[in-house]
């Protein structure tokens, strides 16, 4: 059994799974990190030239302009918080590789594509174990729906039983 002590933040707005995952990863490796979802979203809005003054503050994450509630790239968000460690892989990881990373204390950040797309969602895998019968399970931290445990193959192909497919992996 391999498990990381990891605290996933609840996403503060409907499209901020990318912000919640990136900030949670930053705080996992540096508990004193000053990153928060609003600060990261403000940086995103400035970079994407959304013409907004800001996306709230760390102390007041509600009441942000609607333009701030945007889907965005986890790769860019992880790079902004200085947590991206290499090039993302356009595929899921094997159970063995997932376990290896978790044993090394590294959460596995994944992009889930819903059905045939284009909607996607970001989560982190923070644990894995194998039963006596050989079933391989993973613990998933989801900034929208919370913690859950999935058979590795089921998570790869049918997350949330909604045709959610693990399509990209981000090294942190």
Go through each PLM region and give its residues.
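Conserved active-site-adjacent core of cysteine acyl-enzyme catalytic domains
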Residues: 44-172
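Active-site nucleophile-adjacent alpha helix/oxyanion-hole segment immediately C-terminal to the catalytic cysteine
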Residues: 1-51
């Amino acid at each position: 059994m391999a498990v990381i002590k990891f605290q996933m933040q609840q996403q503060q707005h409907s499209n901020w799974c990318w912000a919640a995952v990136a900030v949670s990863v930053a705080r996992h490796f540096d508990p004193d990190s000053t990153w928060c979802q609003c600060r990261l979203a403000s940086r995103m809005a400035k970079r994407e030239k959304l013409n907004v003054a800001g996306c709230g503050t760390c102390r007041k994450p509600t009441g942000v302009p609607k333009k701030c509630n945007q889907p965005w790239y986890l790769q860019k968000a992880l790079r902004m918080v200085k947590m991206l460690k290499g090039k993302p892989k356009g595929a899921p990881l094997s159970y063995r590789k997932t376990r290896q990373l978790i044993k090394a204390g590294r959460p596995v950040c994944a992009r889930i594509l819903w059905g045939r797309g284009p909607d996607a969602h970001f989560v982190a895998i923070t644990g894995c174990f194998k039963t006596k019968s050989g079933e391989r399970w993973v613990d998933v931290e989801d900034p929208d729906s919370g913690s859950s445990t999935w058979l590795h193959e089921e998570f790869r192909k049918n997350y949330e039983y909604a045709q959610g497919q693990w399509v990209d992996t981000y090294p942190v």
